[in-house]
Amino acid sequence: MGSVEAGEKKALGWAARDPSGVLSPYSYTLRSTGADDVYIKVICCGICHTDIHQIKNDLGMSNYPMVPGHEVVGEVLEVGSDVSKFTVGDVVGVGVVVGCCGSCKPCSSELEQYCNKRIWSYNDVYTDGKPTQGGFADTMIVNQKFVVKIPEGMAVEQAAPLLCAGVTVYSPLSHFGLMASGLKGGILGLGGVGHMGVKIAKAMGHHVTVISSSDKKKEEAIEHLGADDYVVSSDPAEMQRLADSLDYIIDTVPVFHPLDPYLACLKLDGKLILMGVINTPLQFVTPLVILGRKVISGSFIGSIKETEEVLAFCKEKGLTSTIETVKIDELNIAFERLRKNDVRYRFVVDVAGSNLVEEAATTTN
């Protein structure tokens, strides 16, 4: 197939239908391939902790049926007449955002992820009024502006986590000028995002300390991920050893936790960068901030430009994600294991290698 703008296309994925979060086969339709669209056959898709929040309606904004998945790697099957960046056969990626207004300050600054009218890759409504559905499916149609090329020679299953976990770490390091060799950084939480934080920061030449709630992952962090140090956050003596020593901490923890112990670890002008999606208010005492001119900031995924940069960076440095592949009919088991933190460190669903059996009612969304 070449440059075609045909009718709607059928897709088959796995969807959650209610806040139980249980996924099952689901048939639906995609919009026709528009002039700026890329029609993609999904090869694989990473599982992010945010997917749990969405399928379980933890944020109170879920719409069902919902096909999750926003770390999507696939092959281009068809392109619209105005598509110039991609051709049939290209291996491409799609992340968290698939639309934006294009005219606000974030959009004009190539920071489309901060657009107030951004469109999520799933659990949202596209400009044509149709629900967006994610990458736990056989196909997707995405505007070319929100598609990136996967570097030649990069394994598809390794590329998938970089589209969210990887760029989520890379973006604040780039934005805050924290890419220089010799910095001392902390990674709080060693999950899918945290493990990429260790690898990327080490590749930038940083001294990296992993901060975790127990010592269960100490050997893994140092022996396999390359961390320089490991501190158990519940050990006061260990935390005291870190006092006033770190240039930054990347906080990936997605549940409530006090910030005071980590603010105390930062140097003058140190930065605590929050990434976990938490609906419970966090707390800290202001002297820890004002007496060290410290910064508490948030950072949300990364832009398309930054996604391209992190893919190129990881290819250049030979960085790989630590993953476990599963078939699509193992999604519910994988989600349950992820809830229990029973994965090292990212699940990637082998969509193309799965048997997408059509068992469910069809919708015309």
UniProtKB/Swiss-Prot annotation:
Pathway membership, UniProt: Aromatic compound metabolism; phenylpropanoid biosynthesis
Tissues/organs with expression: Expressed at the lateral root initiation sites, in the vascular tissues of the primary lateral root and the root caps. Expressed in the hypocotyl, cotyledon and leaf veins, apical meristem region, hydathodes, at the base of the trichomes and cauline leaves. In stems, expressed in the cells associated with the vascular cambium, interfascicular cambium and the developing xylem. Expressed in the vascular strand of petals and sepals, anthers, stamen filaments, stigma with papillary cells in flowers, and abscission, style and stigmatic regions of siliques.
Pfam families (alphabetical): ADH_N, ADH_zinc_N
Keyword NADP found: yes
Binding site for Zn(2+) 2: 101, 104, 107, 115
Residues annotated as binding NADP(+): 50, 168, 189-194, 212-217, 252, 276, 299-301
EC number annotated for this UniProt entry: 1.1.1.195
Cofactor(s) recorded in Swiss-Prot or TrEMBL: Zn(2+)
Top-level taxon in the UniProt lineage: Eukaryota
Effect of a null allele: Reduced lignin content and rigidity of the floral stems.
Keyword Metal-binding in record: yes
Cofactor binding note of this UniProt entry: Binds 2 Zn(2+) ions per subunit.
Any one GO biological process: lignin biosynthetic process
Record's catalysed reaction(s): (E)-cinnamyl alcohol + NADP(+) = (E)-cinnamaldehyde + NADPH + H(+); (E)-coniferol + NADP(+) = (E)-coniferaldehyde + NADPH + H(+); (E)-sinapyl alcohol + NADP(+) = (E)-sinapaldehyde + NADPH + H(+); (E)-4-coumaroyl alcohol + NADP(+) = (E)-4-coumaraldehyde + NADPH + H(+)
PROSITE patterns in alphabetical order: ADH_ZINC (PS00059)
Keyword annotations: Lignin biosynthesis, Metal-binding, NADP, Oxidoreductase, Zinc
GO cellular component, one term: cytosol
GO molecular function: cinnamyl-alcohol dehydrogenase activity; coniferyl-alcohol dehydrogenase activity; zinc ion binding
InterPro entries for the chain: ADH-like_C (IPR013149), ADH-like_N (IPR013154), ADH_Zn_CS (IPR002328), CAD-like (IPR047109), GroES-like_sf (IPR011032), NAD(P)-bd_dom_sf (IPR036291), PKS_ER (IPR020843)
Amino acids binding Zn(2+) 1: 48, 70-71, 164
Family: Belongs to the zinc-containing alcohol dehydrogenase family.
Role this protein plays: Involved in lignin biosynthesis in the floral stem. Catalyzes the final step specific for the production of lignin monomers. Catalyzes the NADPH-dependent reduction of coniferaldehyde, 5-hydroxyconiferaldehyde, sinapaldehyde, 4-coumaraldehyde and caffeyl aldehyde to their respective alcohols.
Complex and partners: Homodimer.
Protein name: Cinnamyl alcohol dehydrogenase 4
Record organism: Arabidopsis thaliana
Name of the gene encoding the protein in the UniProt record: CAD4
